[in-house]
């Protein structure tokens, strides 16, 4: 095993640190680095880029927190991220893959198989997190528990820096990483996205920008294209109907949506995070809102007006059910 960086307690004075008050302290019988997690703390080891390899660290928290590992860091606003959640220990999201785009977390867009894993991660305990990655796949594991297998890492850049991350206070020790080719790939199945949604609209024309595409899971990730300062967009697509009939639009979104057909509002709704143990109240983007409309023969213009209210994922998923319709090319929308 080739180790290219190792530190019992990472020294914040020699690293890039986005944290107002990093501290070296004692926690659970061990010397540790404490990050405050105010506004999401990020520590980056400079000058060491990894395209493939492994990263491991011990971490823990006294209560609610999201301590994790950032990798393939392109800059302080764009990177791959995986973390544990001691306050949801044993639940479906106790281990979460959550790529960061333009400074926004996106876990409401990346969930389920390939993004979340049941693990036991109790508070007030040292826990070992390890990530192995190569190409667009990664294995993320807490101790010897069942690993999370990510078949499609979200970012397109294939190399970057390594760091630590947390929202809310957490403790870290024994950070090390290397660039050995991981051996998990031989036993990891090459599969499509098992969490892919049944969507029919995979391209949109975003006004003021151009044509954009959905992710592998069928969800449109607006954070990929927009900075946090852009909180409202208009998405357009045209559909041709050969004969009149009833159509069903199944839509999922985050955070607020107004859907128009030929400039007539057919749906308005809000889907926000709620601090709840219920899956359906977390604000995940899933096309489970149904709108039924009668469309006459001809070309109809769909307009989705989306507004962001949180930094957990800004996105849309749309599936159209009906006979004989045809989506016109997105680049023809103006």
Q: What are the functions of these language-model segments?
A:
Residues 37-104, 181, 205, 230:
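Secretory/extracellular carbohydrate-interaction modules
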Residues 141-161, 266-278:
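Short, solvent-exposed beta-strand-to-loop segments that form ligand-recognition rims
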Residues 246-259, 302:
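Aromatic-lined ligand-binding clefts that engage carbohydrates, nucleic acids, or primary amines
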Residues 258-303, 307-317:
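Beta-strand-rich ligand-recognition modules
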Residues 23-41:
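Short carbohydrate-recognition loop motifs
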Residues 104-128, 291-292:
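Short, aromatic/His-centered strand-loop micro-motif at the edge of beta-sheets
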Residues 76, 171-242, 275, 307-334:
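Extracellular/secretory pathway-exposed regions associated with glycan biology
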Residues 121-151, 256-265:
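Carbohydrate-binding surfaces in secreted/extracellular proteins
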């Amino acid at each position: 095993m080739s180790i290219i960086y190792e530190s019992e307690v990472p020294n914040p004075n020699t690293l890039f640190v986005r944290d107002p008050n990093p501290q070296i302290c004692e926690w659970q019988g061990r010397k540790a680095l404490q990050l405050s997690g105010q506004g999401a703390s990020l520590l980056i080891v400079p000058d060491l880029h990894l395209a493939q390899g492994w990263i491991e660290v011990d971490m823990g928290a006294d209560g609610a927190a999201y301590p994790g590992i950032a990798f393939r860091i392109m800059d302080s606003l764009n990177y791959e991220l995986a973390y544990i959640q001691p306050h949801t220990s044993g639940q479906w999201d106790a281990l979460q893959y959550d790529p960061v785009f333009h400074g926004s977390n996106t876990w409401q867009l990346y969930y389920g198989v390939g993004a979340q894993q049941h693990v036991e991660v109790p508070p007030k305990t040292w826990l070992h997190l390890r990530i192995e990655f190569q190409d667009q796949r990664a294995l993320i594991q807490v101790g010897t528990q069942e690993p999370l297998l990510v078949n499609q890492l979200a970012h397109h850049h294939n190399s970057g820096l390594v760091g630590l991350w947390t929202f809310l206070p957490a403790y870290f020790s024994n950070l090390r990483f290397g660039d050995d080719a991981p051996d998990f790939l031989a036993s990891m199945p090459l599969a499509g996205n098992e969490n892919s949604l049944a969507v029919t609209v995979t391209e949109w024309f975003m006004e003021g920008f151009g044509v954009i595409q959905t992710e592998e899971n069928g969800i449109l990730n607006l954070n990929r294209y927009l900075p946090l300062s852009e909180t409202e967009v208009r998405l357009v697509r045209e559909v041709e109907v050969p004969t009149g009939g009833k159509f069903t639009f199944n839509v999922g979104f985050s955070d607020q949506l107004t859907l128009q057909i030929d400039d007539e509002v057919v749906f308005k709704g809000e889907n926000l995070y709620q601090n709840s143990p219920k899956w359906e109240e977390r604000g995940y983007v899933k096309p489970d809102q149904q709108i039924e409309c009668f469309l006459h023969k001809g070309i109809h213009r769909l307009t989705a007006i989306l507004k962001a209210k949180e930094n957990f994922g800004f996105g849309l998923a749309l599936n159209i059910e009906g006979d004989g319709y045809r989506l016109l090319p997105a680049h023809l929308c103006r």
